[in-house]
C-alpha cells in the first residue's frame, strides 16, 4: 500500500493584497503579484482500514479519529480536513466515502500572513486526490481549494493564496468579473532573484492575527463606498501592475519604492491593518537599514516582510530582536507549486550488483543516492537496498 506525500508552498504577497477579496474583486477586478517561498504545508495520506477516518496535526497537538458515519465529530478540531475529504468524495469519488489516514503540518503558524491555511488545503486536496488516482490541474486545484475555504466553510479571504500554492513561483494574477482568475507566470532574471533574496528578511513578532476581522472591515468599506478606503484599494491594484513591471526589468530600488507605496495605501483600507507594535517594529527596522517593508497577508499581525540593504542584514535583524523581541529570518523563493509523491511500503528487491552498478554510475556523475530512497525515471523505478 502506497503512502502519498504532498506539499504546497507558502507565499509572500508583494502587491495587490485585498483586491482579490469580494466584493472588490468581482466589481473592479483584482490584481495580485506574489511569490512562493521555501516554507511549506505538508500532507501525508494513506488508505485507512475498515470505515475509519483518522486525522493528525502534530504542529497543533491535535489528533482524532471517527467512523465514516461519524465524520462530523471531527469538524471542531479539523474543519479543513473534513471539508477537503467531503469535497474529494463528491468531486472525484462518485460520492463514495473511503477510509483515510491524513496527517498534516505547516512550516508557519496560523495567522502568519503567508497563506498557510490555503496552502494546507491545496496540499491536502492534491494528496488525497492522488490517493484515489485523480490529479486535478493547477487551475482546478486552486478553484476547488478556494471553494472549500470560502464557500463550504464560509471563511473570509480572497483567492490569491490558493492560486499561489497551486502554481508556485513569481506570478501576476488577475481576476475577471465572472470570477475567472488568470495566472501569468513571470520570468525573473536570476541575478534579480539573487538580489531580492539577499535583500529580503522576515520578522515575526510572535503575534498572529485573525484575518477575518481585517477582511470584514475592508469589505464593509467597499460596500459602503468609503471614499478614502476605495481610492486606496484602487491605488493598491494599480501599484501591483507597476510593481510587476519594475520586477520584470530588474529595477529593485523602484520595486522597493512601489512596495512602500503599496503598504501606505493598504493602511488606508482599514484601521486594523497596522497597530502600535507593527509601527514600532517598522520604525526600528527603518532606522537600522530597512528600505521598505509591509505586513504580509491581510495585516494586523503576522510576518513583516522587509527589503533591506544586503550589507546591513545583520544590523537590522539584531536591532529588531533586541528592541522588539521576536525573530528574524531570511527566506528563498521557489519555482514549483503543489506536488505529490509516493513512498512504497514495500518494493520488490533488486539485485545488489545492479544497484551497486547504478549507484557507481551515478556517483561518477556527481549524484549521490541514499540507501532506501526511490529512484524514478520515465521508464522504471528502482529501490536502492538498505
Curated annotation (Swiss-Prot):
Annotated pathway: Nucleotide-sugar biosynthesis; GDP-D-glycero-alpha-D-manno-heptose biosynthesis; GDP-D-glycero-alpha-D-manno-heptose from D-glycero-alpha-D-manno-heptose 7-phosphate: step 1/3; Lipopolysaccharide biosynthesis; LPS oligosaccharide biosynthesis
Q: Does the keyword Kinase apply?
A: yes
Is the Lipid metabolism keyword given for this protein? no
**GO molecular function terms attached to this record:** ATP binding; galactokinase activity; metal ion binding
Substrates-to-products reaction catalysed: D-glycero-alpha-D-manno-heptose 7-phosphate + ATP = D-glycero-alpha-D-manno-heptose 1,7-bisphosphate + ADP + H(+)
Which annotated residues bind Mg(2+)? Answer: 117, 149
What EC number(s) would the UniProt record show? 2.7.1.168
* EC class (word): transferase
* UniProt cross-references to InterPro entries, sorted A to Z: GHMP_Kinase-Related, GHMP_kinase_C_dom, GHMP_kinase_C_sf, GHMP_kinase_N_dom, HddA/FKP, Heptose_7-P_kinase, Ribosomal_Su5_D2-typ_SF
Q: Where is the active site?
A: 161
* GO cellular component terms listed in the entry, alphabetical order: cytosol
Set out the biological process GO terms recorded for this chain's protein. Answer: galactose metabolic process; lipopolysaccharide biosynthetic process
Q: Please report which protein family the annotation says this sequence is part of.
A: Belongs to the GHMP kinase family.
Q: What does this protein do?
A: Exhibits ATPase activity in vitro.
Assembly state and interactors? Monomer.
Concerning PANTHER family, the annotation shows:
L-FUCOSE KINASE
Q: What is this protein called?
A: D-glycero-alpha-D-manno-heptose 7-phosphate kinase
Q: What's the source species for this entry?
A: Mycobacterium tuberculosis (strain ATCC 25618 / H37Rv)
User: What gene is it encoded by?
Assistant: hddA
Amino acid at each position: 500500500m502506497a503512502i502519498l506525500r504532498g506539499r504546497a508552498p507558502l507565499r509572500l504577497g508583494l502587491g495587490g493584497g485585498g483586491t482579490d477579496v469580494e466584493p472588490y474583486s468581482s466589481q473592479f477586478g483584482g490584481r495580485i503579484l506574489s511569490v512562493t517561498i521555501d516554507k511549506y504545508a505538508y500532507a501525508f495520506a494513506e488508505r485507512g482500514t475498515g470505515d475509519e477516518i483518522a486525522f493528525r496535526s502534530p504542529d497543533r497537538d491535535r489528533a482524532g479519529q471517527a467512523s465514516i458515519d461519524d465524520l462530523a465529530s471531527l469538524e471542531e478540531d479539523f474543519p479543513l480536513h473534513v471539508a477537503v475529504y467531503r469535497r474529494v468524495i463528491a468531486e472525484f469519488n462518485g460520492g463514495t466515502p473511503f477510509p483515510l489516514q491524513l496527517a498534516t503540518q505547516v512550516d508557519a503558524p496560523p495567522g502568519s500572513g503567508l497563506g498557510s491555511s490555503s496552502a494546507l488545503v491545496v496540499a491536502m486536496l492534491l494528496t488525497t486526490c492522488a490517493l484515489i488516482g485523480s490529479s486535478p490541474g493547477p487551475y482546478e486545484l486552486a478553484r476547488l481549494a478556494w471553494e472549500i475555504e470560502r464557500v463550504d466553510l464560509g471563511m473570509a479571504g480572497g483567492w490569491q493564496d490558493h492560486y499561489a500554492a497551486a502554481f508556485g513561483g513569481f506570478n501576476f494574477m488577475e481576476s475577471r468579473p465572472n470570477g475567472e482568475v488568470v495566472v501569468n507566470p513571470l520570468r525573473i532574471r536570476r541575478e534579480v532573484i539573487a538580489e531580492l533574496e539577499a535583500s529580503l528578511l522576515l520578522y515575526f513578532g510572535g503575534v498572529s492575527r485573525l484575518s477575518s476581522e481585517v477582511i470584514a472591515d475592508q469589505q464593509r468599506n467597499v460596500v459602503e463606498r468609503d471614499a478614502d478606503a476605495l481610492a486606496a484599494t484602487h491605488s493598491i491594484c494599480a501599484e501591483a501592475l507597476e510593481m510587476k513591471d519594475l520586477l520584470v526589468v530588474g529595477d529593485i530600488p523602484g520595486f522597493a519604492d512601489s512596495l512602500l507605496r503599496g503598504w501606505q495605501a493598504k493602511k488606508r483600507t482599514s484601521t486594523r491593518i497596522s497597530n502600535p507594535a507593527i509601527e514600532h517594529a517598522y520604525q526600528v527596522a527603518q532606522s537600522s537599514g530597512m528600505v521598505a517593508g509591509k505586513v504580509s497577508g491581510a495585516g494586523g499581525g503576522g510576518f513583516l516582510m522587509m527589503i533591506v540593504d544586503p550589507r546591513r542584514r545583520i544590523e537590522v535583524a539584531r536591532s529588531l530582536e533586541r528592541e522588539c523581541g521576536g525573530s528574524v529570518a531570511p527566506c528563498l523563493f521557489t519555482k514549483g507549486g503543489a506536488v505529490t509523491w509516493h513512498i512504497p511500503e514495500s518494493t520488490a528487491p533488486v539485485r545488489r550488483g545492479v544497484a551497486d552498478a547504478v549507484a557507481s554510475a551515478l556517483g561518477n556523475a556527481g549524484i549521490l543516492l541514499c540507501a532506501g530512497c526511490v529512484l524514478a525515471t520515465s521508464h522504471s523505478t528502482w529501490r536502492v537496498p538498505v
